[in-house]
Amino acid sequence: MSPMARTAPVPAATDPAIIRNFCIIAHIDHGKSTLADRMLQYTGVVQSRDMKAQYLDRMDIERERGITIKSQAVRMPWEVDGTSYALNMIDTPGHVDFTYEVSRSLAACEGAVLLVDAAQGIEAQTLANLYLAMENNLTIIPVLNKIDLPAAQPEKYAEELANLIGGDPDEVLRVSGKTGMGVEVLLDKIVRDLPAPVGDPDAPARAMIFDSVYDTYRGVVTYVRVVDGMLHPRERIQMMSTRATHELLEIGVSSPEPTPSKGLGVGEVGYLITGVKDVRLSKVGDTVTNLAKPASQSLPGYADAKPMVFSGLYPLDGTDYPVLRDALEKLMLNDAALVYQPETSAALGFGFRVGFLGLLHLEITRERLEREYKLDLISTAPNVEYEVTLEDKRVVHVTNPSEYPTGKIAEVREPMVSATILAPNEFVGAIMELCQSRRGVMGGMDYLSEDRVEIRYRLPLAEIVFDFFDILKSKTRGYGSLDWKADGDQVADLVKVDIMLQGEQVDAFSAITHRDKAYAYGVMMTGKLRELIPRQQFEVPIQAAIGSRIIARESIRAIRKDVLAKCYGGDITRKRKLLEKQKEGKKRMKMVGRVEVPQEAFIAALTTDESKDKAKK
């Protein structure tokens, strides 16, 4: 029952034995945020009249797309057998781009609720997050959600879940986040089954940052889980990775609105406000300690967020460049994984090369720039970072085709990923064919049940950042799901394909591609530009080249005036003279003429990824 009417445990004076830290892990769309809503309601921290769907998803984009991007932490009281417990629920993102955030959120917990949609079953990202939870030695409570749906098959999927984590299908809880059925039983089970946090209250303070958000009025709000010792307001604290020191202006818990407290003790989850304005000073995974009595060792598992996908962002209107720069700076306050640097393109003008965690991250960032800052942007095709070694042993890191070195190249290394694909078994052939065509190497295959297969492949990252997810969805009729993680790099036979108009290179259309696919890219791009560039007074050749070797060509025919219109009958030599004269003029025009590529052609040619990105939700 909810103890809101009685005494709820007070932050900073809570015995670790009555604290339970847990998170909910699930694939996108399996009802994680809806279940969180019901928990908030049943524990009484949000009144029914204040309730709104997906209460914890604060960003417009999160609400519209129905995805969780930023983690949230909420403290909820719950009473079992006459004892009041403090439950800390850490809501995690479900998408593959945000795996590091999920891993830090899991490290802040002792247990996880593994949520599976009773109508869809286990999906790739459920598995990936489950393995992360197992690596962190979390106690796992299996739960089937959406059992009120007519299409639900609880018996079938309860067996799948039991096979996966070991146990009995009858132990799998059945709940409905929508109607609230089974939620109270789940809350009781969390209290009974999950272990209490362990830590030394007298040791130097150590707290792990699992998220940080930028608040316009208060600066950076850092969410932490205290492992050892205590943190009090007005203390000086230190971040152990950057050695930066701050004064702790406010400390408290989210319940779910921020509530200041007298401090945070062992096992507690809460927020810190230091008045700092830059999220990069509060890095996810870092350890916070007390400056007066610092800890000697930081908590394990910290890693810097590393961008995987790079894309050029250019404003359609060149005068918007300063606005774009300010907008990116502001977004960086809230998103420590975003990196950018200015770049120029002869065709597109001034812009930025921006690094992202993955395609969803790219799409969300771009959408936020367009929506919150009213910018019209062109984004170039997404690239990955290549490591090019020249024959003189120099190493160049390339994120943009225009930086690709022209000298003698000894080898090129490209990033690899290990991908896990889950799908019904009738699609195995189609999936293997797709992965083979993307230079994939099969790693193994397991049957989760008689009709669901887990297929593992090692693929180049460049092959999956463009349209892989889309094609996978269409080949599996929407039933396939994908999860991937970085897996080193390997040597590859890559070349740079240049597109030339009238013999002049257009940098915006260049691409780094595998030698086997260079011809296909050249033919596709020249064909597309032929359709998009308006006809000129003279013939315009469009060529694709690798170095100095032309691999594909299309021509835009010249517009000709009918110079013979005024000749009624008459001698053929008269007509020939007029045609020769026209030909001379066209030749002269071709020598001095320049082709202006209209903005629309750039947008159409570069947004081949638009339709493809739409499915990556």
UniProtKB/Swiss-Prot annotation:
CC annotations in GO: plasma membrane
Topology with respect to the bilayer: Peripheral membrane protein
Single GO MF annotation: GTPase activity
Chain sites annotated for binding GTP: 29-34, 145-148
Keywords carried by this UniProt record: Cell membrane, GTP-binding, Hydrolase, Membrane, Nucleotide-binding, Protein biosynthesis
Domain named tr-type G: residues: 17-198
PROSITE patterns in UniProt: G_TR_1 (PS00301), G_TR_2 (PS51722)
GO BP field: positive regulation of translation
InterPro entries: EF-4, EFG_III/V, EFG_V-like, G_TR_CS, LepA_C_sf, LepA_CTD, LepA_IV, P-loop_NTPase
SUPFAM superfamilies in the cross-refs: EF-G C-terminal domain-like (SSF54980), P-loop containing nucleoside triphosphate hydrolases (SSF52540), Translation proteins (SSF50447)
Main location, first listed in the record: membrane
UniProt enzyme class: hydrolase
Source organism, top-level taxon: Bacteria
Keyword Cell membrane: yes
Catalysis: reaction(s): GTP + H2O = GDP + phosphate + H(+)
Localization terms from the record: Cell membrane
E.C. numbers: 3.6.5.n1
Pfam families: EFG_C, GTP_EFTU, LepA_C
Function text: Required for accurate and efficient protein synthesis under certain stress conditions. May act as a fidelity factor of the translation reaction, by catalyzing a one-codon backward translocation of tRNAs on improperly translocated ribosomes. Back-translocation proceeds from a post-translocation (POST) complex to a pre-translocation (PRE) complex, thus giving elongation factor G a second chance to translocate the tRNAs correctly. Binds to ribosomes in a GTP-dependent manner.
Family classification: Belongs to the TRAFAC class translation factor GTPase superfamily. Classic translation factor GTPase family. LepA subfamily.
Name recorded for this polypeptide: Elongation factor 4
Organism for this UniProt entry: Arthrobacter sp. (strain FB24)
